[in-house]
Amino acid sequence: MISARWLYCLVLLLATESCRLFCQAASKSKENVMPRPHDVCDGVCKNNASPCFQSCPPNSEGNMKFACKAKRWHKVTETCHTLNAHSIFEEDKELYSVQSSESTIRTHMFNSGLKTITDTLMEKCPKDLSCVIRGIEKSPRIPGNIAVVVQLLHNISTTLTKGVDEEKMQSYSAMANHILNSKSISNWTFIQDRNSSCVLLQSINSFASNLFMKGHLINISHVFIHTLGTVVPRNSLGKNFTFSMRVNDTSDKVTGRILLTTEELQKVPSAFQVISIAFPTLGAILEASLLENMTVNGLVLSVILPKELKNISLIFEKIRKSGERKSQCVGWHSLESRWDRRACKMIQENSRQAICRCQPNKFFTSFSILMSPNTVESPVLTYITYIGLGISICSLIICLAIEALVWSQVTKTEISYLRHLCIANIAVTLLMADVWFIVASFLSGPIVHHNGCVTATFFVHFFYLSVFFWMLAKALLILYGILIVFHTLPKSCLVASLFTVGYGCPLVIAVITLAVTEPGKGYLRPEACWLNWDMTKALLAFVVPALAIVVVNLITVTLVIIKTQRAAVGSSMFQEVRAIVRICKNIAILTPLLGLTWGFGIATVVAGHSLAFHIIFSLLNALQVSPDAMIESEWRGC
């Protein structure tokens, strides 16, 4: 038995036509199931029990379907409705008294079941559509009635493709306002056609797109839907639409603004009309099914524009105000029935509001912001990061200063020279990586400082990779000291090889990553100056080489330790073996520390947004330099 939650997610992911076919199939399969007796869908049940159907309360038609989950009956769908052709036209009851509501209303699928009501509406009040408003507003907001109104709005939007004026829009908005009430949100869960909320949004946008204005501002305001429209003259200096609405009866008002810049308006050769609609509760109804752990945190703003306008700016005040939770600007994909991050980019964000730049088109006309419920930032994390980076930078500077002081004394042999060459370059690359990391953190984001973000991210990527590749170079030194064949290589050749490994390989990887992902705007993360993960997985260009080097180094150290046990004290190889063992110790300490550090770094991106992972990563990142920073062996000699 599929649970109600998973059935909900499955249907919502489907496009409108697919949802209709699914619901039709579900309706047919329901007819083949022998329903249990009415009024027994309560209490304990068996997990493999067949669905239970219960009759609706008096004065309503339909039924309620229950499924057994965790050995208890839970309501899955409800088709109970009081609205029908008999009640919706309250003043003409006799006209439809002989018609059965079952023959005129089908709440479980979008078909021609409400054609009679729609046709009668067009006959009775085609001028303003007002003859059904009283009947709808008096009806309870139960799931079946919501489905009836959604179907009616859908039919009206497909019937009236022209000649929509302010009066019709006023009545249409009043019908939608009734089912968008905050008190009805929980009942949307039980509507049999889970795609109803998508159809509602699409129907409202479609109907509004046919609205014709007579040169004056249109302002149709209801509690849960607000429509603004105006005619923009040619060469206008810019327009903005501001909404201020309550999400529920007890909350404060939340604002949303749509901004059209002068530059964009110049692209339209003649006067045109702009229509914008705001919904305070529709975000709670529309499920962000393809973006896990995300909730709508602002008004849903729809905008109908001429096709020449490609960019708009939107300012969303946050419903839940938090500086520790990142938001994402999104557009509603009308074909795929889901929120899509590709439609918008974040320009600026603080604890109270988010500014987005979006690209409306025939698929994207509605926009909002999503908020992750997981905390990914905190003042503690910020302090630890900057204090840790300060400690790291100071340690690295001390390390390089000590290396400079003792350089002539500790580089007398070839292998010692090469060893300290690696140590110095590890310190330099880690120092540069930390500096560029700080530069990247001070940039406000990839939208405001895109070129600066690209530059900072490139160098952070390059220098952190260089740290790992110089660690690999130190491992290669072990092989140089153990394998006789390498003794024939001149010192200059070895130095060139080390620099090729330490800087050449990271440079190639960093350049290829930038060249492949940046043209499609997939190089940077939307909210920070670092490699993208969600869209292009560019972060793998750092993760894969780094962890591969960690594994190779650990294997190399293990093999060399086994081999060096054969060298006897006083033998000709003994002194070189002692130097090699020092390198092994150094690598054996640094490699796990570096690997552990970036293992936690990966966990912060892939395995969730736990604050503990971020704090551990910041601490290890600050301390990973300390074994080399002490440089104990420099004072002991080689």
Swiss-Prot record:
Residue ranges that the UniProt entry lists as topological domain Cytoplasmic: 408-422, 487-493, 563-586, 632-638
MF terms in GO: G protein-coupled receptor activity
Positions on the Extracellular side per record topology: 26-386, 444-465, 515-541, 608-610
Membrane-topology descriptor: Multi-pass membrane protein
Sugar-modified residues: 155, 219, 248, 293, 311
Protein name per the record: Adhesion G-protein coupled receptor F2
Segments forming a coiled coil: none
Similarity section: Belongs to the G-protein coupled receptor 2 family. Adhesion G-protein coupled receptor (ADGR) subfamily.
Positions of disulphide bridges: 329-356, 344-358
Matches recorded under Gene3D superfamilies: 2.60.220.50, Rhodopsin 7-helix transmembrane proteins (1.20.1070.10)
Subcellular location: Membrane
Additional detail: Most adhesion GPCRs undergo autoproteolysis at the GPS domain. ADGRF2 is not autoproteolyzed at the GPS motif because of the lack of a consensus catalytic triad sequence within GPS region of the GAIN-B domain.
Main localization (coarse): membrane
GO-annotated biological processes: adenylate cyclase-activating G protein-coupled receptor signaling pathway; cell surface receptor signaling pathway
Spans annotated as GPS: 329-377
Gene Ontology annotations for the cellular component aspect, listed alphabetically: membrane
PROSITE patterns the record matches: G_PROTEIN_RECEP_F2_4, GAIN_B
Domain GAIN-B: 233-377
Recorded superkingdom: Eukaryota
Transmembrane regions: 387-407, 423-443, 466-486, 494-514, 542-562, 587-607, 611-631
Role this protein plays: Orphan receptor.
Signal peptide: 1-25
Keywords: Disulfide bond, Glycoprotein, Membrane, Signal, Transmembrane, Transmembrane helix
Record organism: Rattus norvegicus (Rat)
